[in-house]
Amino acid sequence: KFRYADLAIARYEDAYNAQLQKSSGKLEDLEKQYYPCINVAFMHYVFHDEKKAHEYAKAAREICRKIRVKGGESYWIQATEAEASLILGQVGPALEAYAQAVGMEDAKPSYVASTRKQALQIASLIEDKEVKGEVEKAFPLMGIVACSGHVIDNPGRDRRFPPEAEMVAKEKIEQALDKLGATCGFSSAACGTDILFLETMAERGGETHVFLPFAKEEFIETSVRRAGGNWVSRFESVLDHATSVHYVTNEGYYGDDSLFSLCNQVMLGFAAMRGRGLDEDPNLLVIWDGKPGSTGGTGELVEAWRGEFNEPEVIDPREILPSLSDSEPVPVYSGETRPAFLSESGESESSIRSIKTMLFADVQAFSQVMEEKTAEFVEIFHGGIAKMLERLPREPAFVNTWGDSFFVVFDELEDALKLALEIRDYFNYGEWGDLLSEGVMEVRISMHAGPVYEEFDPILKKRNFFGRHVNQAARIEPIVLPGSVFVSETVAALISFGYDDYDFEYAGNLELAKDFGSYPIYMLQRRGYSGEKSD
């Protein structure tokens, strides 16, 4: 960790010094200096080099004051000056500056949330523990809300969320969002609750993060067009205006309801991940009749949420229906609820998929293993991992090795997380220098989760796993920093919702191997690795 911290500090210092060399003292030059300067100060402070932290904090504050004199007032200038004062231990001036920043016209909720996170990190390192509480009071919460709920009723079913209930439901959503102070929303985009929530969040000027379980066109057929009317155009509109759109998989539905469950888990995980980064508990808003429901439904989601967080904010549709008793039903123009791409029997037209976690590992400097030490390497690498596999509570779904590489598929994410960190520690803390002609033997480990195809492999004579999500896990592995575990954003989200023993750091939006594309990648750690007290 400290090795990568040194690299980050050096990068910010290089950026700051480069701007200093080019500076002519003009406003546009100063505006390029304060950001790398305060980041160097923050990094030095976090890694306990107070002298350098103070040096850069003073420089950053002076740059901000010069910018202000030249008429360059902005939220970030004010927030940077506040952070510099806090690093310097000047708590009173820092709190005053933070309050001024939060009240500025260009203070967007996402800006304030980011500033709050960094301020709390600094405050947690100050000897006087009351300072953190004072800093918390200087900022409003972001108001993170995940939402789910019933879709508009299919024609002919018992009334639960009929089309004519839409306006009353929207009013109740507006009231709930006011109560929760919502500025950041997470939801899928089915007709009914989801789209109403996303539209209302957009009207409030909030962020909207949309999650779809599979390909867009098939989602429209399963979960939007069924309601008739203008729901499809409204679906397109909320996606067009969304802050982000995430797909659990870009493939089709194929009658696989487990994708709805995974989508719920990922969506709640993203909300939890946002709250985790900001030291803020997210909230859940649902339109729900209190019944368990089907796979991937609202009842399943509420049960999972209650196991991890607070009580959800529930809008009961049964309380809406009495107000509609004298209303004329709104006509529904589409009675077709069965997706055209499913067979009459309801079976998938494709092979069976299942949700799995994939782990790839290989050893850096394997080519430097001395020939006469090959048998010893096999005992260390294969033998060591074999013992770890025996200690797992469940047998993996699949294991394969070739040379210095290792591939394993898990039914349970917990098993993959446990094994990944055990392998990492086994290599990081072992003494393997005698095996190599030169270099250091370190392991690279990658993980991803998603729906994969399970097929009989005629070469291995046993079942094997295939598909894009297997490929994605494999393409992460070559870019892993030696001695580390890199995981996909999906895994990071799942960790955030229900895996309290694990943590992660954002590594960046990285280009994966073999032109697979750029993806957000995270470095897996155990909870408390940074000195943070575990609850």
Language-model features: where?
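Boundary/linker segments of alpha-helical solenoid repeat arrays
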Residues: 22-24, 28-30, 64-73, 105-117
